[in-house]
């Protein structure tokens, strides 16, 4: 009795399977490469962030993560993975508090390692142009407190391009009318405090015309 034998795959079928396997391998390789590249970049960014936080805390400052600001007390992400990579890997530092005369220009250099910062409090800090220059790259910044510092008109040039800034406290600083010209482009500014400065009524009026939606306290 003659039995049917399975027919071997045709060359065309083998070729199609080979093409599919090669294509799938290439896709998987690309996904792994992209994923590992992203992971590597984030690990490096978090390393820089941790160094910045250590520098801030060494000067008596404090930082807060985004998940500490809202209703959640811990970051998103599975617990086992947070245990492996750390809670901070799944959060962003959004607030930094560096007040008092222990904070100088060198200490302020740490904020460059916190690119997602939204609130920065520097009341009483001993900062000059070199220190304030570190702030200009914090494009996510929404609230900045420079009260009771030795900030002058010169330093204001370093904050004129912060696109999201909504609150700025310059109380008890050496700011004068000419320096206010640097603030006229801050279209998102809603609160500006100028108490105990040398700013005049004329200076406030000129700035108010440029920023009609901003409340200026003087």
Where are these regions (language model features)?
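Beta-strand-rich cores of mature extracytoplasmic or soluble domains
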Residues: 2, 114, 118, 196-197, ...
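Cullin-RING E3 adaptor/co-adaptor recruitment helices
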Residues: 3-52, 57, 64
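Ser/Thr-centric signal marking residues that sit
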Residues: 21, 104, 125-128, 149-152, ...
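Stable alpha-helical elements in mature extracytoplasmic
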Residues: 48-52, 107, 131, 155, ...
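LRR N-terminal entry segment and analogous cap-like coil->beta motifs
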Residues: 54-136, 140-153, 166
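C-terminal capping segment of individual leucine-rich repeats
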Residues: 89, 110-113, 134-137, 158-161, ...
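Ankyrin-repeat and related helical/solenoid repeat scaffolds used for protein-protein interactions
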Residues: 163-198
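Leucine-rich solenoid repeat scaffolds
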Residues: 184-218
């Amino acid at each position: 009795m003659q039995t049917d034998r399975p027919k071997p795959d045709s060359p065309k079928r083998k070729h199609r399977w080979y093409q599919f396997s090669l294509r799938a391998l290439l896709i998987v390789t690309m996904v792994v490469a992209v994923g590992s590249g992203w992971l590597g970049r984030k690990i490096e960014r978090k390393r820089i962030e941790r160094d910045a936080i250590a520098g801030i805390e060494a000067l008596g400052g404090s930082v807060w993560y985004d998940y500490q600001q809202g209703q959640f007390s811990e970051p998103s992400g599975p617990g086992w993975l947070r245990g492996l990579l750390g809670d901070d890997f799944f959060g962003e530092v959004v607030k930094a508090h560096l007040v008092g005369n222990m904070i100088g220009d060198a200490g302020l250099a740490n904020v460059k390692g916190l690119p997602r910062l939204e609130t920065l409090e520097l009341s009483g800090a001993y900062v000059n142009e070199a220190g304030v220059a570190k702030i200009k790259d914090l494009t996510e910044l929404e609230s900045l407190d420079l009260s009771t510092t030795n900030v002058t008109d010169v330093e204001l040039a370093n904050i004129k391009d912060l696109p999201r800034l909504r609150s700025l406290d310059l109380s008890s600083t050496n700011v004068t009318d000419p320096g206010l010209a640097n603030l006229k482009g801050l279209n998102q500014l809603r609160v500006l405090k100028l108490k105990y400065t040398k700013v005049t009524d004329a200076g406030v009026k000129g700035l108010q015309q440029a920023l009609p939606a901003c409340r200026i306290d003087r």
